């Protein structure tokens, strides 16, 4: 499995992985992403900002994740406490967003590999933590995060979304 920065040539394959992720969430009764998120313009912006990574194997797209060291304003007002003092204006963390895997090639450890890659990237940038959030109903993601050593630190409500469920659970993993 190779994990690399996405390019615009990957757009259609990435969109297909996200469509598959939307379908997975819908099957589980989770309303996250059902409004079409992540939108094509978001995917393009993630690629242009060099923050979108793809996991591939022999030209098959296994998964995708947005990894950013730029901070996240949504994380500035959680109901809870981050373990590190970083804010969106002065981030000391790597943000992980929009993780999706291809169900047609499931059970290859793709999500675990993407999170491991995120940890390596955070260390390269000398960051102190990784932060991620997820829908309260996404029990698979909650279980994965806990298995990978993330701690549930609080919750917040998305400010700029059309999704029905705005509540998100926040997780953090400290790097030593």
Language model regions located:
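Conserved GNAT-fold acetyl-CoA-binding loop/helix
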Residues: 15, 22-42
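Conserved acetyl-CoA-binding loop-helix of GNAT-fold acetyltransferases
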Residues: 101, 107-120, 143, 147
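Conserved acyl-donor/pantetheine-binding loop and adjacent beta-alpha core of acyl/acetyltransferases
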Residues: 66-100, 159-162
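A short beta-loop-alpha structural element at the N-terminal edge
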Residues: 2-16
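Conserved active-site alpha-helix within GNAT-family acetyltransferase domains
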Residues: 112, 124, 136-154
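Conserved catalytic-core motifs of GNAT/GCN5-like acyltransferases
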Residues: 72, 133, 146-167
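Conserved GNAT acetyl-CoA-binding A-motif
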Residues: 115, 122-134
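Conserved beta-hairpin
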Residues: 49-65
